[in-house]
Design a protein with these regions (language model features):
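Helical subdomain adjoining the active site within ATP-dependent kinase catalytic cores
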Residues: 4, 19-25, 29, 33, ...
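ATP-binding glycine-rich loop module of kinase domains
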Residues: 19-79, 101-102
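Conserved structural core of kinase catalytic domains
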Residues: 71-114
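Conserved alphaE helix
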Residues: 110-124
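Catalytic-loop of the protein kinase fold
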Residues: 122-143
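Activation segment/activation loop of eukaryotic-type protein kinase catalytic domains
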Residues: 138-173
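Conserved end of the kinase activation segment
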Residues: 176-187
Length: 258
């Protein structure tokens, strides 16, 4: 966990031996991403050369370091400079992204345990006045002990800093209701988390899930009955809604009963 007063390391871009790194086959608009061959560290080299944008990232990074007291976010601990700030280094988390959770686990009880841990971690992040904003299953890393870690943290909104990043799940949802938010707030994060949950469970967007299909799935996964009211609320035409965290709807202590 990061404490107040902890300073980030800093290295020169020219000191990085890229022959010892492997470039990840990951389509990112923001960065070229590498991992060392021992899979200990993630290197991100920003694609932008806009000095104002880079300066903004550096301010946000400093705030994230100070905020991450509960350790639920993977915040870079080293900055890379090449005359100016141009990248970061952070620890690599062995495991899988949440979008691969059904490949790793077939047992719905195990899957639900992971989802509930991720939901509780999201609440912890919100309590530190951070909004994930680009919340999606590729940005939640599940380690080998089934604990969740929120990654790609420079896309988050910290306190009152402006942030233009919006999750594709939330963007689709807001567009369907003709909503143009001024900023992404934690209540939207909670909606996005449930959108993500239903998306992974049904392998389609919420807008494509029919009520009859949902009710049929309830026979297979019992906890969906508890989520039916939230599902209806999300699918409703109401613009301003507030949904609970997943772990507030489903008792984490009863994860063997899903």
């Amino acid at each position: 966990m990061v404490k107040e007063g902890v300073y980030m390391d800093r290295i020169s871009y020219n000191d990085i031996d890229f022959n010892k790194l492997m470039k990840l086959d990951y389509d990112s608009l923001e960065s070229n991403i590498y991992v060392d061959k021992e899979k200990q560290r993630i290197y991100k080299i920003f694609k932008t050369e806009d000095l104002c944008e880079l300066s903004y990232k550096l301010v946000k990074l400093d705030l994230l370091q100070r905020k991450n007291k509960k350790g639920k976010m993977i915040v870079p601990d080293t900055t890379i400079f090449d005359r100016h700030f141009c990248g970061t280094i952070e620890k690599y988390v062995p495991g899988v992204n949440l979008d691969d959770i059904f490949i790793k686990y077939r047992d719905i009880n195990h899957v639900m345990k992971v989802f509930l841990d991720a939901s509780k971690s999201l609440q912890d992040i919100h309590e530190e006045k951070v909004v994930v904003a680009d919340l999606n299953s590729a940005n939640i890393r599940i380690d080998e002990n089934d604990k969740s870690h929120y990654i790609d943290t420079l896309s988050y909104r910290v306190e009152n800093l402006d942030n233009n990043t919006v999750s594709y799940l939330l963007k689709e949802y807001l567009n369907s209701k003709n909503i143009q938010p001024k900023k992404i707030i934690k209540e939207m994060d909670k909606i996005t988390f449930l959108l993500m949950y239903f998306n992974l469970l049904f392998n389609k967007s919420v807008n494509e899930i029919s009520y009859s299909e949902y009710e049929k799935k309830e026979d297979e996964i019992k906890c969906l009955k508890n989520l039916y009211d939230s599902f209806k609320l999300i699918k409703s035409r109401r613009k301003n809604i507030d949904v609970p965290y997943l772990h507030e709807i489903i008792d984490p202590l009863n994860y063997k009963k899903y």
